[in-house]
Amino acid sequence: MYGIVRHSLAIAAAFCVGSIVAANAFADAPKGQALYTRHCSACHQASGEGLPGAFPPLKGSGVVIKDDATKHIRAVLDGLQGGKAGGVAYASTMPAFAAVLGDAEIADIINFECSSWGNHGKPVTAAQVAAERARP
């Protein structure tokens, strides 16, 4: 009986800690929004809807709302050339931001994108960005 109670309490505690971590990841939304406005909105627009045929939308983007943020982090670090989004081909180039922005700044931008325009993506930490930056 006590084992079940202890196990239940451990699960509840883990859930609470996870919720606090997620809430803290989105806590710098104003900073993320300011960075997004400065570095991203000219192409992806303030609305996150991009420009059809020129710059892909971030609103509702599979890259933004996936549980695994690796592709999103790599796109910001390394930039992108062309590709398809939502069945639309894009020939434009997204610049790399690895030399321009720090890990916390990239995490703030990604977290802003993950929590804006109706997106419900998983929060990203500066440590995750640093780990991706360190990978070849």
Predicted features by range, described:
Residues 23-27:
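C-terminal region of N-terminal signal peptides and the immediate post-cleavage residues
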Residues 28-70, 78-88, 115-123:
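Periplasmic/extracellular electron-transfer cofactor-ligation site
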Residues 7-16:
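Sec-dependent N-terminal signal peptides
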Residues 1-6:
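N-terminal secretory signal peptides that target proteins for export/translocation
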Residues 84-136:
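Flexible coil segments in periplasmic/lumen-exposed cytochrome c-class electron-transfer proteins
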Residues 17-22:
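N-terminal signal peptide c-region/cleavage motif recognized by signal peptidases
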